[in-house]
């Protein structure tokens, strides 16, 4: 298909924890859905191919740790679709140590957040068609949701602190 500029495979991870398995299944399902609607901005870098003519190398941030997402988004912005092929799979090994596993996840999340922030000029680009809403949705999921969760946590702590202070009778309190 000449409209496709980049294709990614679905990972089958060996050694993943139970909670990650559910996340990976959901992640792949979303990528496949985005591919059917238009394109996905995220692919697994371990197994992806793209047309070199569809990639603007000058637009890539070489120090970014989300290079696969950069490539996928760059190809789509330059007019070709990006899909995750449901029939293509590859084997990926999860880090054995929990600390290394967590470090990998945090680096990936930070890289995707930075990448999405750099792409904000495309959130409402009509030329991108259905891809612009996909980009906005991913930005909301990866940038706004964590901020809202932190805000909710702080509000909860503040509320309980106020309730706790309201219960103290300061008129009869003495320092000893």
Sequence positions of predicted segments:
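Catalytic donor/gating beta->alpha subdomain of glycosyltransferases that bind UDP-sugars
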Residues: 3-28, 62-138
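Acidic-residue sensor for enzyme active/binding pockets
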Residues: 27, 34, 44
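Loop-to-transmembrane-helix entry motif
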Residues: 33, 37, 137-138, 143-147
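Short loop segments at secondary-structure junctions
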Residues: 35, 52-54, 79
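Conserved nucleotide-sugar donor-binding
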Residues: 44-58
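Membrane-embedded multi-pass helical conduit in multi-pass membrane proteins
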Residues: 141-176
């Amino acid at each position: 298909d000449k409209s496709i500029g980049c294709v990614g495979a679905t990972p089958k991870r060996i050694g993943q924890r139970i909670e990650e398995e559910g996340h990976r299944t959901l992640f792949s399902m979303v990528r496949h859905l985005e591919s059917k609607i238009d394109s996905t901005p995220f692919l697994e870098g371990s197994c992806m191919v793209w047309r070199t003519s569809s990639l603007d190398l000058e637009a890539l941030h070489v120090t970014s740790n989300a290079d696969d997402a950069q490539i996928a988004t760059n190809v789509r912005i330059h007019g070709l679709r990006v899909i995750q092929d449901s029939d293509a799979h590859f084997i990926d090994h999860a880090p054995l140590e929990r600390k290394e596993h967590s470090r990998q996840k945090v680096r990936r999340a930070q890289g995707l957040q930075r990448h999405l922030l750099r792409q904000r000029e495309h959130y409402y680009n009509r030329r991108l068609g259905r891809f612009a809403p996909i980009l906005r949705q991913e930005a909301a999921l990866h940038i706004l949701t964590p901020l809202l969760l932190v805000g909710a946590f702080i509000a909860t702590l503040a509320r309980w602190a106020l309730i706790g202070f309201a219960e103290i009778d300061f008129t009869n309190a003495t320092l000893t």
